[in-house]
């Protein structure tokens, strides 16, 4: 018989959610991240560095040694680009565990294997992942260990959507813009 547990007790325990962010981020960085999530402002690299460090520390506590920019390409499956928190060993032989805001915000996987990628020269087939801060990061546990999964959008270097998330994010922005326009016309 399998082990029994209360789902309510474990639900979301591997999600870098709002509660975790409030606990681990300085108040001003948390506030700036929330404003970024609402589309009011862009996130500064300094704030991204603080968020990345807090996210890394939390993920390491959960057993993660790697992170991945996780996305849904047009192939209908999920895709991941893995990197390690572990950097070159120090002179004493111990490793550094690092994760920068730049690494959090943007990745550069090869897009040549995705739809229309093979039709272009390799340098033109570049794809970029961009962190979607409106979707929470999470730790996925597996047989090979734990990995911090960072939800991202995936676009070509020309801005063409190469995933299923980017069109949804763009349509949400368009609907929001038009809804606000209509409300203003109605006097609100």
Question: Which role fits each region the language model picked out?
Answer:
Residues 1-2, 188:
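Polar low-complexity intrinsically disordered regions
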